[in-house]
UniProtKB/Swiss-Prot annotation:
<dbReference type="GO" id="GO:0004674">
    <property type="term" value="F:protein serine/threonine kinase activity"/>
</dbReference>
<feature type="binding site">
    <location>
        <position position="33"/>
    </location>
    <ligand>
        <name>ATP</name>
    </ligand>
</feature>
<dbReference type="InterPro" id="IPR008271">
    <property type="entry name" value="Ser/Thr_kinase_AS"/>
</dbReference>
<dbReference type="Pfam" id="PF00069">
    <property type="entry name" value="Pkinase"/>
</dbReference>
<dbReference type="InterPro" id="IPR000719">
    <property type="entry name" value="Prot_kinase_dom"/>
</dbReference>
<keyword id="KW-0808">Transferase</keyword>
<keyword id="KW-0067">ATP-binding</keyword>
<protein>
    <recommendedName>
        <fullName>Serine/threonine-protein kinase SRK2C</fullName>
        <ecNumber>2.7.11.1</ecNumber>
    </recommendedName>
</protein>
<dbReference type="InterPro" id="IPR011009">
    <property type="entry name" value="Kinase-like_dom_sf"/>
</dbReference>
<feature type="binding site">
    <location>
        <begin position="10"/>
        <end position="18"/>
    </location>
    <ligand>
        <name>ATP</name>
    </ligand>
</feature>
<dbReference type="GO" id="GO:0005737">
    <property type="term" value="C:cytoplasm"/>
</dbReference>
<feature type="active site" description="Proton acceptor">
    <location>
        <position position="123"/>
    </location>
</feature>
<feature type="modified residue" description="Phosphothreonine">
    <location>
        <position position="158"/>
    </location>
</feature>
<dbReference type="GO" id="GO:0006970">
    <property type="term" value="P:response to osmotic stress"/>
</dbReference>
<keyword id="KW-0723">Serine/threonine-protein kinase</keyword>
<keyword id="KW-0418">Kinase</keyword>
<dbReference type="InterPro" id="IPR017441">
    <property type="entry name" value="Protein_kinase_ATP_BS"/>
</dbReference>
Length: 343
């Protein structure tokens, strides 16, 4: 870990806190997610690492490596300087249809790539959609903690995700197609970009999760009169927000929809852009590191001594000056099975 120095805190998420770091040799910036060793290294963490490392696409945050400190597991990944798409919408209120399409095209490109590798995300939302720092921002999907691989796992049947984005079939305890559920979540993202509000929240009581779930189950939504949305876009949304997953539009059909194809960037016709190769760490190395991280730790404080840096005070990861904030719980990410009382 000695090769990285900490620049600043950049937030907290489902499993830990994140820091912006700089590679001392290349000067490249990376984001590092720190997860406390021991019980917090659960199946979600392992799934996130193993699925994320296999994904190499311009619209997905690039996984670099996983490392151990004395007290934490550290996930090193690409840094998205543009922040969350959520923040951009909060600042703008809502996007024009052209701007919403620009971001939606990239989102679908990244999700389609995941699905081509039999990986469904299962927690797609604006907060998990980052932007790079370029003038025409590139979408970067992140946070694969809830993702499920069709190669490694059976069809998902657990109720996970964020209530506002969750598909009707996910609310049941039966198996469902995670890819089709991802389509629904992409539709919610598109709607929020266009309208500046969630499609299934009751405008008079947006915090009532039971009302939200009731509207989701009925696919009950409306586009406000004050928002100008083309008929083509309305048609696409109506094909996404279909309660029966068997009748819902697929990613492939979205890619061929007339609204989606308008102003489609050339590189999306030609396939993925050239990207850096996969992590240099082997699967065996990563599995060993994860298993080590699961073992109870005996170190009493901080990140001191990680990577053998001992008591250095230069701000490098693992130095004794390192101070991690307490992990925050993301209360938006809840098991909605707890909400399923009679409507």
């Amino acid at each position: 870990m000695e090769r990285y120095e900490i620049v600043k805190d950049i937030g907290s998420g489902n499993f830990g806190v994140a820091k912006l770091v700089r590679d001392k040799f290349s000067k490249e910036l990376f984001a590092v997610k720190f997860i406390e060793r021991g019980q917090k290294i659960d199946e979600h963490v392992q799934r996130e690492i193993m699925n994320h490392r296999s994904l190499i696409h311009p619209n997905i945050i690039r996984f670099k490596e996983v490392l151990l400190t004395a007290t934490h597991l550290a996930l090193v990944m690409e840094y998205a300087a543009g922040g969350e798409l959520f923040g951009r919408i909060c600042s703008a209120g809502r996007f024009s249809e052209d701007e919403a399409r620009f971001f939606f095209q990239q989102l679908i490109s990244g999700v389609n790539y995941c699905h081509s590798l039999q990986i469904c995300h299962r927690d797609l939302k604006l907060e998990n959609t980052l932007l790079d720092g370029s003038e025409a921002p590139r979408v970067k999907i992140c946070d694969f903690g809830y993702s499920k691989s069709g190669v490694l796992h059976s069809q998902p049947k657990t109720t996970v995700g964020t209530p506002a984005y969750i598909a009707p079939e996910v609310l049941s305890t039966k198996e469902y197609d995670g890819k089709i559920a991802d389509v629904w979540s992409c539709g919610v993202t598109l709607y929020v970009m266009l309208v500046g509000a969630y499609p299934f929240e009751d405008p008079s009581d947006p915090k009532d999760f039971r009302k939200t779930i009731g509207r989701i189950l009925k696919a009950q939504y409306a586009i406000p009169d004050y928002v100008r949305v083309s008929d083509e876009c309305r048609h696409l949304l109506s094909r996404i927000f279909v309660a029966n997953p068997e009748k819902r539009i697929t990613i492939e059909e979205i890619k061929n929809h007339s609204w989606f194809l308008k102003n489609l960037p050339v590189e999306m016709y030609e396939g993925s852009l050239m990207m850096n190769g996969p992590s240099t760490q082997t699967v065996e190395e990563i599995v060993w590191i994860i298993e080590e991280a699961r073992k109870p730790i005996t170190v009493a404080t901080g990140l001191a001594g990680a990577g053998g840096s001992g008591g250095s005070s230069n701000g490098a990861i693992g130095s004794s000056s390192m101070d991690l904030d307490d992990l925050d719980t993301d209360f938006d990410d809840i098991d909605t099975a707890d909400l399923l009382s009679p409507l």
